[in-house]
Amino acid sequence: MNLEAQISKIVEANGAALYDIETANEFDETIYRVLITKTGGVNLDLCATISNELSPFLDVHPPMNGHYRLEVSSPGIERKLSKPIHFQNAIGEKVKVKLLGGDKLKGVLKAADDKGITVETKQGEESYSYSDLGTVKTYFEW
């Protein structure tokens, strides 16, 4: 079983689901970020519990060479969409899309399947395959 599957098992044992795993460098520090979701929301106690269970596991099965800081959190209201399941769960939400060619668009995610997405923009519905997409994020108008 690979590392992501093992992490997912630990997360699911606590009633949550693994959303994504990211590695980031912030302020000369490497962060290994485990993003989780749960129906009804994610709270600090859940993040702490999962972090406390993941930490000894990752001490034995390090996710990378060198020092890192483990962070367990929700992906947030404005979150990156990268897997087909992320897009399928975000149907009806507002998204910002940056295409690989550099073009950008905003709209409402209308559909998503295993091949691509459809976004309702001011110009109408536009469909893209996943291979056309650069970065896609949900956004919230404050």
Swiss-Prot record:
Keywords: Cytoplasm, Ribosome biogenesis. PANTHER family: RIBOSOME MATURATION FACTOR RIMP. It comes from Sulfurovum sp. (strain NBC37-1). Required for maturation of 30S ribosomal subunits. This is Ribosome maturation factor RimP. One of its GO terms (biological process) is ribosomal small subunit assembly. Its main location: cytoplasm. GO terms for cellular component: cytosol. Belongs to the RimP family. The keyword Cytoplasm applies.
